[in-house]
Amino acid sequence: MFNQLSDEQKMLKKLALLSGIKPCTASSMLFSFPYSQQKLIDASTQKLFDLFGKLRNTDRLKFLIEEAIDRGIDIDVQDKDGFTLLHKSINERDYNIAGFLLERKANPNIHDRDIVTPLNRIAGKPLSKTEEDFHMAKLLLQKGALTEPTDFSGWTPIQYAVFNEKIGIVELLIDYGANLDIIVPKGFYKGKNLIELVRAISSIFSDQSLNKQLQTLLKLATACQNNDFGLVDYSVKKENSDTEDDSVTKEDIEKFINHKISIKPSVKLLPKYLKELIRLKGFLETKEEFIKDNTIKRLEDNINSKSSLKYLLLSKIVESPSLYKFDVGMPEDLKESLEEHGLKLVGDID
């Protein structure tokens, strides 16, 4: 039985499935990955790469990297495996060094010879589900990591995050606008979208409640993205009911809304964010229980606030923020949002 396998065996079986190899066959032990073009580096730089995983003194490693940069080394140079210094730090889970490199403008979108980016790598590690992984993925996205790079299997980060039960990273990628209509291009799960993928691997999950949480998150997020609320098999949960099913409850929707309201989308993602909230509000207005409480009002308030923010961020204020001043009646949350986007209005123009 699959559930009786060790974590390492589960990981190997998952990798075999991703590569299109049927489990329990001789070929499942011999799958390999294609390589991309290699880039060679000089011997002194190779020594720096070799220190990863060996030198445990983080400050010393930072010093050596700084010294190499001062000598003129390209921070994005690649070794024979296509790894950059950022790749090496991610592979070794040395996230302190990874953050250090990103602050020095390391490119988060370079792929190695297996066409794997740092974000692909974090999402694709089957046995690594820590807070550190989540925060590293978040930092990569904040520093410009793309959400849609495909690796040797044609998988994107969100597909790997779903497959590996990393619900925090799935939610993070949704916040950053990841494509939720992505289809598995080949292999055992060929043709499946994200929701179908979660259902297909439900027997692999040791925690079935986590599988349901993933399904619920993807149903709601995809419904908002595509304005297709037929995906949301909503039901009012009856008190004292112990029945477990795949339906989306009022509590699920409220949790989803709370998260959506809490995030601070970039200027680029604001239009998409607003469109999705307006669609969700329209869906909830057909449900009496949401009309009775303040859920819809909370959505309306957030939509109005973010719409005002969008208007200001796309106006002439952005060109010369120092010339303008805050309107006396401007809500505090809007003032804070402007300042979070780097706009301090201290001038004389209303």
UniProtKB/Swiss-Prot annotation:
Renumbered ranges of ANK repeats: 81-110, 114-151, 153-182
Q: Which UniProt keywords apply?
A: ANK repeat, Repeat
Protein name from the UniProt record: Putative ankyrin repeat protein RBE_0589
Query: What species does this protein belong to?
Result: Rickettsia bellii (strain RML369-C)
